[in-house]
Every structure is written in structure tokens, then in C-alpha cells.
Amino acid sequence: MVDVNRFKSMQITLASPSKVRSWSYGEVKKPETINYRTLKPERDGLFDEVIFGPTKDWECSCGKYKRIRYKGITCDRCGVEVTRAKVRRERMGHIELKAPISHIWYFKGIPSRMGLTLDMSPRALEEVIYFAAYVVIDPKDTPLEHKSIMTEREYRERLREYGYGSFVAKMGAEAIQDLLKQVDLPKEIAALKEELKTASGQKRIKAVRRLDVLDAFYKSGNKPEWMILNILPVIPPDLRPMVQLDGGRFAASDLNELYRRVINRNNRLARLLELNAPGIIVQNEKRMLQEAVDALIDNGRRGRPITGPGSRPLKSLSHMLKGKQGRFRQNLLGKRVDFSGRSVIAVGPTLKMYQCGVPREMAIELFKPFVMREIVARDIAGNVKAAKRLIERGDDRIWDILEEVIKEHPVLLNRAPTLHRLGIQAFEPVLIDGKALRLHPLVCEAYNADFDGDQMAIHVPLSEEAQAEARILMLAAEHILNPKDGKPVVTPSQDMVLGNYYLTMEDAGREGEGMVFKDADEAVMAYRNGYVHLHTRVGIATDSLDKPWKDNQKHKVMMTTVGKILFNAIMPEGLPYLQEPNNANLTEGTPDKYFLEPGSDIKAAIAELPINPPFKKKNLGNIIAEIFKRFRTTETSALLDRLKDLGYYHSTLAGLTVGIADIPVIDNKAEIIEESHERVEQIKKQFRRGMITDDERYAAVTDEWRSAKEKLEKRLVEKQDPKNPIVMMMDSGARGNISNFSQLAGMRGLMSAPNGRIMELPILSNFREGLSVLEMFFSTHGARKGMTDTALKTADSGYLTRRLVDVAQDVIIREDDCGTDRGLDIRSITDGKEMIEPLEERLQGRYTKKTVKHPETGAVIIGPNQLITEDIAREIVNAGVEQVTIRSVFTCNTRHGVCRHCYGINLATGDAVEVGEAVGTIAAQSIGEPGTQLTMRTFHTGGVASNSDITQGLPRVQEIFEARNPKGEAVITEVKGEVIAIEEDASTRTKKVFVKGKTGEGEYVVPFTARMKVEVGDQVARGAALTEGSIQPKRLLEVRDVLAVETYLLSEVQKVYRSQGVEIGDKHIEVMVRQMLRKVRVMDPGDTDLLMGTLMDITDFTDANAEVVIAGGIPATARPVLMGITKASLETNSFLSAASFQETTRVLTDAAIRGKRDNLLGLKENVIIGKIIPAGTGMARYRNLEPQAINEVEIIEDTVAEELAAEAELEAVTE
């Protein structure tokens, strides 16, 4: 066997007949499988032990040789070699075909490789291969054309005309094989290159295609005639198994049936040839053999598929590779693993952030080998077998050992769907009773888990390296930030928010108001004994609290509440005392107005203070972000645990309940609705009189009901009591929002009809009053549509993520600095007047390219190649700088990846990114994971002013990444200059826009209904949009340069996500967009070996040019190509990655002809062949590190093997 971690690359080529023979261990001559009585494989059949090896380890077929000591001997009676039965997975056989057979992949694929090689149409090829026509192989002296096609009748006529033997014409694959042998590759290639110099149009396209295929054959050393098979390999029997079912029947792989048909037809053909049967019968048999081989290779590719019982198409070799159930995606990219389990999850509120609860029964099964080793080491049992029996009996002594074994041994928890890297995290297991896994409530948000029956899988990392990685890199307490935007992902939610909200509320005039305490303990004691309430405003000596007071705040009395004293007690030292829920208090310290000199009239001072709002979910998020910024991970996760405990405790104490009386009644609801009814009546009257159109009437009516709903909502907000439990839940951010509340207390409002149009009849009732039957019926449609949309969106979003991962999986941080001389100019992203992404956010965590100076004073704010921190970013923006040149992924020169400086910080950790970080995969997950939050709809831009639907939400993201022509496309200018005129042409219903520049004039025809973005006198740049709508990126690439397209795509993706309130770091989108523009198309090869029209990687193109320029030749020219992510994935240099993505057969066909070599640079290729992936600790620079165990553990694998061998020998003797 090949050592997986040793080889550097993998190549795929066409197999020559001699190669197939060298693989084979013998010829399969009979279609039989196994003998129905003895159940032993038949001789010369598809399961023959002589060819494929023994069915039992170390035992020949007849039983003469048994046991390992006869290893390598071939039995003289039955001819079977004594070896492991595992060889039946590796040894191949072959079938000697009695007639050449065409390989369907090369004849039927698009484009047909055989057709291009021979310059014949696929239709003509099909007629020849399936014996419907003759092809001229050698016209000799006749006027017949070489490779011309003729029917049977024409053939006979020509024979009569020119005489027998005057020319050679044949049919079937044999004819094609002869033609392929005649192809002189160097000569054909030279002729095509000549032709390309003058050809144009269709002719040119065809020549480029032919040249591509012929050049591939020539360079790879494959011979074209190998596309025709003379010998057919038979795959090992264990890869097409036959198993006995309970009822004594057999279930066999479909491949056996397909092979049987081939062998039957091949044998029949051999017999017919021996008997010198009539030509027509032989021809028919050859055609049937061709069809049988076609079905074996790719059933259903041509004609009707061969079916099995119940007219189910049989699964051929191609189907074994294709699709989600195929070899690539089912067995190579994802395998089922041992040391794993799954169970329902339940909440573990008492756990620490790095812990999870594992049921005892599950743990003993998962850690069985570890426990067994310990049992043997402690001499509780003599050997491994006895230890196993102890565990199976459930001996009491095993539980203590299990406790010790799992200590410090992390486990991984995973919840499907794993949308981003936070879907798998490591925890320290804690043994619990029951059968459900316990999960820490704060990690739920990262997993998107809840406790309504969700299940999770658990995995045990075995090796010391794996345990170390799980503990250091994957521990849940380390994952505070979300990789997509660098914001905390573990903000408290629901009860925790509610508890802290209740705790930090303030009340005027509560019992004990104005009491002064010497320290926190005294305040808590007073609260416990009922002298003060949590919400009571009291005073406390500042010196007793360990907080960073300003000088004027020391030795004072501070006015606060008992709840806030408790809330601040859990905060880390060094954080200001949090009195107001705002950022100023958090970053700059407690405001001075809360401090008094000791002995002042505190009651009067308190009475003058306004009531502060409590801390809401958003405020807690800000506090966590600030603490992470100051104290990093460990302190943050400890604080989160304290916040969680405090929140749960006080939400329990608060005892919030919800009853129907908590839903207020709006006193003037009837009046508001009555007014709206009158207004609607007036609108209808106007319509009946013909004063407004039907569309205007519809818009006015729906607007009227919307405003009625808003009035009720406004009234609700005015009336709401801050102590109302529903209001508290809503205001704190624990659950629900104003729209839920207004449906409970106001009115439900307008609903959408099944066709998506909003119905004019609103639902006037709310849930407190109850809906009428008709209203209920109206509202069901919206509810169902919501469920359906969610389901469809999830699938769409998952597929988008898969394509994104595929295109960027080989983007890894490869070096420290690429030394590029280019940078990216960035400014705020805006849409009209609306701010999409401010400059400050875009600058954070990036490196500068040029020095940034203060625009007024000229002082240097930051030099080149330096990291822009949050504070520096704020300083740059405050100085009034509008544009900064930064290092960007777009301009990075690193091959097969990105350098650290162009990428910036790793958003998941807040630190500089490490070499080896798989930033491509992180980028793909960051863009794909929020996909489910985007809408599915394509919106109308409203009103009559526009006829274009602007695509938004998920469909727009797909449109951008697939580089499709957008709906509602904008017209762009190719000239830089001034708009000199806009003329309307009523006859053609169009407008004409005239742009005049230094280089020339442009005239652009715009649809009449399109909304103009420019006016006469405006200055426009090249590629600027003249009308509203999305620019077609491929068109922009023609007019402008690559960087302009990249910048445009980046801002377009941000617009979609930001409009839905989803924040994504620019760098993730940069990584994806860069992958879409990696290729160039060669326009003129110059003196290089490149072929015209070839698509190639930009780095390979530059290398080829560099070589030629050094030698003093003319370099090639090329044009950048923008590819959608699906196409870019399929065009990757790695055929393994492309084949496992989509269109498996097409990718493999192409790779084989080209003799492609996969250098295993990406992650996917390495996963497929089972090699350690070249990212993180798998990179070459980290590969040879030896793990050092802290305490030496005795490894007892050898003893186990010795024991088992001894037992086996003992059994042999007793037999």
C-alpha cells in the first residue's frame, strides 16, 4: 500500500491496454458469481478466488492450507494464494473483448472528445459505432473522401462501382480505432495553429476547441486510440459485493448484473466468430456488446437505461461516483467515524462555559478502551478481555476509573447543520445521570440550538495531538467572537437578559430610598432583610468598591441601586462602575453627577436624578465586547458564566408571569378604525369618479390601513407600563418585539394573498379580542408561506455555502508578507444617501499601504504597513479622512493563498492571523451562514416610476457570486466626461443619453421607463451607471479594470447583507471575489507555448511570460475573465476537488485526456486521499513536531496483540 502522507501529487491518465493487463490478476471468462449450493465462488467467474484472492483470511478455497504460517503459498489443489481476504478489495481482473468497444465517456461527453480528435460530428460517430453506417478508412485510388460516411446501401453501390478491395470502409468501434491510430498529432496541431491565424467566427471557435484536445493528447502522452477498449478491467469483488439476506436470498451490487451482460455477450460473440456466422448476426452481437459496455460504464447516458426488477435503472460505474450518494461525497469527503454518539440535548445551566454534560452510559461506551487500559494497569482484571467483561457487566469499580479517564480529555460536540466553524466546539465532559447531553446555554447561539428536541453528536479526539488541538483551538470558552464580523457571539439571551434587566431597574420612592451603606456587603444584608428593594436608589461609599475612580470621585458617596451594586460586583476589576446603560459610562467612566460629598442631603439629591433605564440585551453585548477588548478570552468567559448565573437567579426571583390582563386595551381603537374606514370610502369614491387609477386606489387603501396600524402602535407605546411583564420582555430584548405586541393589543393589519399581493381587507381584530373565522382564514396563508419559505431558503442557502466553500477551499494564509506594490483605496460604502458600511468599520483590523496624514495639520496618523486598530480607525475618521489606501486580498501577490499583511486580523480571535489559517473556508462559511436570514423575495421598487424588479436577498447574492446578468440591468457609460444631453424619443419609447469626453462621445439608448441616475451637466467616470439598477459585472470588466469590478462586487454583496442587518467583514467577501477573477484567457500566445483561447490561472500566465521575456521573446497577451463560483470551482487546477463538486464524469474525462496532475494544494483533495490537510498544524512547517506527553502513559496495544495471538494458538491446539 502507498503511504498516504508520503506522496506529493496524484495523476490521472487514460489506461493503455498493457496497463490494464498489468493490473489484472486473471481473466474473468464466465458470468457466474457463486455456486448456489456450496455458496463458494465459481471458477473463472466474477468472484473467482484464484483471480481475486481468498474469501477467508489465510485460508485457501479447498481448505488444504489454513492459518497464517502458510502465508504466500499458492495451493496446489485449488490454485488460491493464502493471504488476507482484504486483497479482494484491491485485486482486479479483466475481460478480453472479442471486438473493440468505444468508451462512452469519450464519445458521448460534451464536447465529444472522439469527435474533436477526428473532426467528425458526434452524430456520424454514433452511426458508425452502433453499426448504422460505414466510414471510409482508406479511399486508396477512388474519389471517395477520407472519413466520409455511407449507409449500407451506398456502401454496396460503391463496391459495385469501384470493385472489391478498391477502398477500405468499416463500421463499429473498430473503424473508429483505425481512424484514431491514423491521427498524426504534431501535424494536426501545426495545421490548426496556421488556420487560427486567419479563421474567425464559428470556424475559429471550433479550431480552438480541437487544438485544445489534440494538444492535451500530445502533451500528456496519451494515445487517442486508447479511447477505444480492447480489454475491459473488472473491479475487485468486494467493491461490488454479494451478501446473503435472512431469507436465504442474495442481494448483489448492480455492477455484477452489468458485468454479466458484458461477459454473456462477449462469449456469444466469440462463439459466433468461431462458427464464421453471417456478417449481419456478428454485427448485431457486436452492437449489443457495445451497448452492454456502455451500460456498465454509464447506464442511461445513451438510449434507455438497462433496468433491474421493478424497472429501476441499474447503477453503473459512473453512478458510483456521482452525486451526494456517490463515492466522492459519501465515502471520501465525509466518513462515519467510531468513538462517536448522538443524543437529545438538554440545558445545563450549572455548567461552566468549557463544560458539557455527558450521560454515564454514553461516556463508558465512548471511553471504553481508555477505561480498559486503566483497569488492566491497576490489576483489577488480568487481561483486556476480562476488562471488557467487567465494563459490560457494569461493575461498580469502573465508574471511578471513568471519572479519572475523562478528566482533562476534551470531547467535540457538533450540531447539524454545521453552517460555520462554531458548529463544532470542544468541551470538557462532566458525567451526569439521564440520557440527554447537557449543553451550556450561552453556546446555543453559536450552534443555533434550542432545547425543543434538538440532537447533537459527540466525538472523542483520540491522539495526544488531537486532544491538544481540541483544548487549545476549539474549547468553547475560546470562541467568544463570531468569525464573520468579529462581534461577540455569546451574548446572554432570554432569561439571562431578563434577570439582568430586572436587576438593574430603578424605581423612585421604593422602601429605604436614600439609605447610605459603608460597603456592598452591608447593602446586600439590608436587601436580604427587607429594608431596601433591588430597585431602591441608595448611596454607597466609593472607597469600598474596587473600581477605577477619577480623582474627584474618590472618598465620595455614590448614588446607585442595590441591584446595580450586585450587577457591578461580578464585573472584572478595572472596568468602570456601570451606572448608565451607555457607551460613555463603559469606556470613559461613571458620570460625575452621581457622586456626593459624605454628609450631603442624599435624599434630595436622589429625588432630582432622572430614572435610568435598565441594561438591555444590546448593552450586555457592548459590555462583553469591551471586556473582551480589554481582558481577552479567559476573563470574558468567566464573566459570561457569572452573568448567566446572575441572570437566571434574578429572573427566577423576579417571578414574571403573563396573563391576559397584561395585554392592555387601547381606548380609542374604535375611533381610529372608524376614521380609516371613512378615508377608504373617500378613496373609493375618487376612484369611481375616475379621479385616480386602480393602482393608485390600491396603494392609497393599503397605505391608509398601514397608517391606522401605526397609530395604534404609537398609542400602545405611549400607554405601556414599564413594569408590564410583556413590555419588560420586549424592552429588554429577551423575547418578542413591538410588532408582536401590537398584534396582541392593537390590530393584526394587512395580510398577503397567495399570489404575494397584499390584500386590501385588513384584519382589524387583535389576539386579545380574538379573530373572526374569516380573519383567521386570511391569516393562515401568510403563516404557511412563512414555513415554506424558510424550508426552501435553508436548502438554497446550504447550496450557496457549498459552492462558496468549494471555490475558496484552497485559500490559506501561506506567508507573512507578499511584498505587493499595490493597494486598495477604500471609503465608506453608501447607496444614494443611505450609509451601508462606514469607513471606520472597513478600516478596523487591516494594514495600511500608504501613510495616512491629517488632512488639515499634515501630522502622520499612521505609517505604511501598520495595523489599524479600533482606536486608530476612529482617529482617522474623526480627522476627516475620507479615503485610505489599505493592503487588501484583492492586491495580494501570494500564490495559492493570501499573506498575513494583506488579510489583516483574524476576526475570530481579534489577533493577527496565523500562517496556515484556512481563510477561504472561513470566508465561505461567514457568507453562507447568514444566508438563511436573508429574504427570498424579489421586491418591486414601488410606484409606477420603474418597470424593473430589483432582486434582493438570497437570490441577489447568488446572482452576484454566479456573475449572472442581473435583473433590471443599469446602462453604463464607456466614456469619461460630461452628460451633455438627454433626449426622449416618443416614437420608439426610449431616451438617449449623450456623454462627451476628451477621448470621444458616447450615445446610450435607455428604456423610457428606466429611472435616470444622472442629469445634464453631471460628470461621469468610465463604467458609471446612467440609470438605476445593477451593473452587469462582465460588462464593467470590459469597460474598466479588474480592481473596479472587485470593488463593485464587494459593495454589492455588502448592500444585500447590511440591508438585512447582517454584518460581514469585507475581507471574507474579498477572498471570494478574488477567486472569481483568478483566470485569464490567452488572446495572443506571442512566443510562449500557450494556446490561443486557453483559460488559465493568472499566476501561471505571469510565469510563462516571465520565462519568455528573460529569453528575449515576445510575451503573450490575455484578457481577465470573470467566472461565477460554480464555474470557477470546476475550472480549479485540482481535478479531485472539481470532480467531487459537480459534473464528476465530465471533469474526470477531461482530466484523464490531459493526464492532469493534482498537486494536492487545497483542503478537499487531501481529505479525499486521506492525507492530513495543509492548513493549520498540517502545514509543512509544523509537520515534524513531536508531541510530548506531560505524564508518560504505558501503551498496551502490543500486549493486547500478544494476548490475542496466544488465545488464538490455544484455540488451535484444543481443536
Curated annotation (Swiss-Prot):
Of the GO CC terms on this record, one is: DNA-directed RNA polymerase complex
Q: Which Pfam families match?
A: RNA_pol_Rpb1_1 (PF04997), RNA_pol_Rpb1_2 (PF00623), RNA_pol_Rpb1_3 (PF04983), RNA_pol_Rpb1_4 (PF05000), RNA_pol_Rpb1_5 (PF04998)
Q: Per its record, what are the GO molecular function terms? A: DNA binding; DNA-directed RNA polymerase activity; magnesium ion binding; zinc ion binding
* Cofactor(s) of this protein: Mg(2+); Zn(2+)
The UniProt subunit note reads as follows:
The RNAP catalytic core consists of 2 alpha, 1 beta, 1 beta' and 1 omega subunit. When a sigma factor is associated with the core the holoenzyme is formed, which can initiate transcription.
According to its UniProt entry, what is the function of this protein?
DNA-dependent RNA polymerase catalyzes the transcription of DNA into RNA using the four ribonucleoside triphosphates as substrates.
Q: Which family does it belong to?
A: Belongs to the RNA polymerase beta' chain family.
Its recorded name reads: DNA-directed RNA polymerase subunit beta'
Source species: Streptococcus suis (strain 05ZYH33)
